[in-house]
């Protein structure tokens, strides 16, 4: 029996992952719950396991142990086609494929839905940018296509992640190539996801990427350290020098939202 579209929660329990074909665990002891309308920022130093966690959340990499569940069903209980409809993913290394802009946003769905393409572009705040390209949504990209800046490609890829309103959207350093206008569009997109009851997970290197989230997960050395409300992190970081406080790190602390 086909599963119903997810609409309530993502639950990660004691999850660990290693890259396919390798034996070294790069991310472990991950525990958290998010409900629809919430957004999570994942922060931590370089090589702390953030991107590996993102790949596990969307099913690109399968957990070595533990589970990732959408509305109670583990990711491997969904067919790849169904999971693809319910999950949007913007990887750290953005790639647009040979074709036009509309096809890339529609994930090469055949035929693409024009209304859904437009809605995704508007949700990503990239519609005006696209209509100013040489051929608008028909502009060719990829090999032998129009040369786009890294920021333009990243914003179009954000629209692709939002296509057809997926329940879970995972964005890995989505503003690494964005200017101030792109940052603002990203924050609006995250707030838009929350407003329609979706879940957003944002791997962040620049603070502006987490402006629209309400929870923070801290990673270090491949392990979850904390899962706390964003305000708690900001309050601790903002303590004046006369009364210094540091973020208390509790290995393996889980949480729910």
Per-region residue spans from a language model:
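Helical segment within the ABC ATPase nucleotide-binding domain
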Residues: 183-196
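ABC ATPase nucleotide-binding domain helical subdomain, centered on the C-loop/LSGGQ "ABC signature"
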Residues: 69, 77, 102-143, 187-188, ...
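Helix-to-loop junction immediately C-terminal to a conserved catalytic motif
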Residues: 58
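Conserved ABC transporter NBD signature motif
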Residues: 66-73, 83
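Catalytic Walker B motif of ABC-type/P-loop ATPase nucleotide-binding domains
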Residues: 169-173
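Conserved catalytic segment of ABC-fold P-loop ATPases
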Residues: 211-218
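Conserved catalytic motifs of ABC-family nucleotide-binding domains
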Residues: 165
